[in-house]
């Protein structure tokens, strides 16, 4: 970044500081990952200069012959990975992908059945502070009070009672496998569309390690980062019958020109996801998550649903007599990055919470293995149990430094 360093020292310094943070801390935020240098090169390419409103072969600007190739590569690779009939890779985010689906099939005030945010859903699945909850009549389903797993009989009962036009499956903090086939059966029984938001598990689905929602859902949305390990962005997969409507909802419906440099980075990441070593990577994510969950439980920590089937773990910190906010802060102080998170049947404010959400996608990208999960579990428990003991926190910092020093990253930057 020689040009940036010479031209804008302040921005360069901030980026360098962030690189230092990523290198020196243990990244456990479940929605984050470390992309390859190839993905970063594509995103930092000259494609950032090109406007390309429209779609390949049907642009509103000239000079799009090369970016057309890039977008076609991205779309074709997604079809190969997930078996989708139609793909739109232009959404700038997962939220915009969800918005486009809503705009395609819903009218203002239509009833939608979505997962309660504190039970593991997402803001765009009907939260009253989000456009989705403002524009549409969302009815919530959740998890069982004892098992903390989705109660499909309750989903069916609510669907029969409220007759939604759309059912939304998928979550941002649900550590268990989702039965997409069952969701489609429920949707068919009440005459609803089914949309699956697979943002968190897309990489696991790509590797064949989580059931694929594409054969069951009318629409599938996802981000392109998280477990898929691409740049920050979104995409939509759908049945061919909805292709024109979905494309129109994205452009000109809710977006103008696509970010062609980001689409290039998406294409590179999708190419990586087609390789055999990506399947190994995804399996390691799950293995690490299971090992970490076991370690946390051995340390006496409480896990929502009692464990995990994917990359994600939700810790209930109430038995430690602290809040999620305190837990996030003290873990960050010793070099472990997590996020506070609501838990099912939450009683605390979303700014405080009773839980912490962690995930293994980023540490697995870095090369951490099973024995390292044992150390991370020990570190988390030790830090939370001694959150007011500065000597203990200093000891934890040293252990974090010793662990991260074993796994250098982005050494060419």
Curated annotation (Swiss-Prot):
Q: Which SUPFAM superfamilies match?
A: PLP-dependent transferases
**Biological process, per Gene Ontology:** glycine biosynthetic process from serine; tetrahydrofolate interconversion
Enzymatic reactions: (6R)-5,10-methylene-5,6,7,8-tetrahydrofolate + glycine + H2O = (6S)-5,6,7,8-tetrahydrofolate + L-serine
Keywords attached to this entry: Amino-acid biosynthesis, Cytoplasm, One-carbon metabolism, Pyridoxal phosphate, Transferase
Co-factor(s): pyridoxal 5'-phosphate
In terms of InterPro entries, this protein maps to: PyrdxlP-dep_Trfase, PyrdxlP-dep_Trfase_major, PyrdxlP-dep_Trfase_small, Ser_HO-MeTrfase, Ser_HO-MeTrfase-like, Ser_HO-MeTrfase_PLP_BS, SHMT-like_dom
Main location per UniProt? Answer: cytoplasm
Q: Where is this site: Plays an important role in substrate specificity?
A: 225
List the record's Gene Ontology CC terms alphabetically. cytosol
Q: How does it assemble?
A: Homodimer.
Q: Which family does it belong to?
A: Belongs to the SHMT family.
**What's the name of the protein?**
Serine hydroxymethyltransferase
Q: Give the species.
A: Bacillus cereus (strain AH820)
